[in-house]
Amino acid sequence: MHFYELIKKLAEHKKTIIYVDMDGVIASYDVGKPFDFINKRPLYNNIKTLSRLCNLKNVELHILSICRFNNQINEKNAWLDKYAPFFEKDKRAIISKECNPHSSKKLKLDYLQSLNTKEQIILIDDDNEILKTIQNNLKEIILFQDSELID
């Protein structure tokens, strides 16, 4: 409820686009485990919190996720279709490092820098390096650690 009320207030008078990371935010992230994304455990509490935001005026939910290989884009989309279908297909940015050989923080920074919008942008991520990189380069973006989703 805390995060819902926070976003409700932020979006009260301004269109707000929320970019949500997948690994570690809405799906479990196990370091060192195989990249079998379709079988990742959904983090239901976070998914439920985010699904409630879809009903808020001025709020649009997007996915911003990185994967290592091109075939994982389809796996992540299938996972979203199964566990979080409220993330519309045309609002999913899943970037493969196979085609873009850069760090996750650079890929997310480049993506967010490429947005040409006057809307308020929020990023929810679990990776402190990514959050710090965005904070240092894109001051206007509002950042939340994934733990903020937990009541």
Regions picked out by a protein language model, each given a short descriptive name:
Residues 112, 117-151:
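Acidic, Mg2+-coordinating phosphoryl-transfer loop and its flanking beta/alpha structural elements
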Residues 63-65, 123:
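Structural beta-sheet core signal
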